[in-house]
Regions:
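Glycine-rich, histidine-containing beta strand-loop boundary motifs that form or position
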Residues: 114-117, 124-125
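Short hydrophobic/aromatic beta-strand element in the GNAT-like acyltransferase core
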Residues: 42-46, 57, 79, 191-196, ...
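Amide-forming acyltransferase catalytic core, primarily the GNAT-like/NAT-type
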Residues: 127-223
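Residue-level recognition of the GNAT/N-acetyltransferase active site
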Residues: 83
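Short amphipathic alpha-helix that is part of the acyltransferase structural core
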Residues: 1-62, 69-76, 142-178, 208-211, ...
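Conserved acetyl-CoA pyrophosphate-binding loop and the N-cap/start of the following alpha-helix
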Residues: 86-98, 219-227
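Active-site/acyl-donor-binding loops of N-acyltransferases
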Residues: 125-143, 205-208, 213-290
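Conserved GNAT acetyl-CoA-binding A-motif
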Residues: 96, 101-115, 231-240
Length: 290
């Protein structure tokens, strides 16, 4: 490997090739959507072999989150992958080391990601931030809940539900109508479904007779009841305060690394990032995966 840099427009198809090799379970339909709507060449850090072949990528996605009641610009890291033939050579770690100064240059005060391996990212300076209940829902807790009426997905209503649901929490992405329009489009792809009631919504991926809930907000009991009436099992991510209610295990969902301490703690009342992050963890919630 002799180069780690932001890829060029002419290398964008190569980045898609790397994604396919690194994440073979993703459909071509989803990959095409992701590269058309969620990322772009200037957001992709690439690792190149000595002969100039793209062998690894790391996506630096700009986000704005609510952090202790204040908007903060962060970098959400996604699509970290090295082609199978070049793994276990320290390439992913090298990409992260190259990414940190670039993140600061671009004005990000922190980096957040969903870990595939908590220990790996802890070695890179990340720490657990968002915990969530993740697993198969105990549908017995939904017995007796009236089956809700279904309404057509509506981006404006989803945004209103999301904002109200997230208000007690911190660490969540600040969204707009366009974000929900994109999510509705994404979850209209093959193998996905969106369900919405008057006071809740859920974005799901379907595997056989199982609904895997990517995100659910509002009165989540109503959307989960609706899904339980359609599928034999429902797996979901829920805030930790619902973990016992739905019988799911609490796990690390997102990790954080401080990039610019002064910017992160500005207006929070804390004198160090360590104190601010420790306090934020108590009520942190996010649905972002990629």
């Amino acid at each position: 490997m002799n180069d780690i840099r932001i890829i060029k427009q002419s290398e964008y198809d190569d980045a898609k090739r790397v994604w396919r090799l690194c994440f073979p379970d993703d459909s071509d339909e989803f990959i095409d959507y992701y590269f058309a709507r969620r990322t772009s060449p200037e957001l992709i850090l690439g690792a190149f072999s000595r002969c100039g072949e793209l062998i690894g990528t790391l996506h630096l996605l700009p986000r704005e989150i609510s952090f202790l009641g204040h908007p903060k610009r962060i970098c959400f890291v996604a699509g970290v992958g090295t082609v199978p033939s070049m793994r276990h050579k320290g390439i992913a770690s090298a990409m992260f080391e190259a990414a940190y100064p670039l993140m600061k240059k671009r004005g990000f005060c922190a980096s957040i990601l969903q870990p595939f391996n908590v220990g790996f990212y802890e070695r890179l300076g990340y720490e657990p931030f968002v915990y969530a209940g993740i697993g198969e829902i105990n549908t017995a807790c939904l017995l007796g809940v009236p089956l809700p009426c279904v309404v057509a997905p509506d981006a404006d209503k989803m945004l209103s539900i999301y904002n109200a649901f997230m208000r007690p929490f911190t660490g969540f992405a600040l969204r707009d109508k366009a974000c929900f329009e994109n999510l509705i489009s994404e979850f209209s792809l093959s193998g996905s479904v969106t369900v919405m009631t008057e006071n809740s919504y859920a974005f799901c991926c379907i595997e056989g007779s199982c609904a895997n809930v990517y995100e659910s907000a509002g009165d989540i009991t109503t959307s989960l009841t609706l899904l339980a009436s359609r599928y034999s099992s429902v797996k979901a991510l829920v805030p930790t305060l619902y973990s016992d209610v739905f019988g799911v295990k609490q796990s690390v969902f997102n990790m954080i690394k401080v990039i610019d301490e002064d910017v992160l703690i500005s207006h929070t009342g804390f004198s160090t990032a360590a104190e601010a992050v420790a306090h934020a963890k108590k009520t942190a919630l996010s649905f972002d995966k990629y």
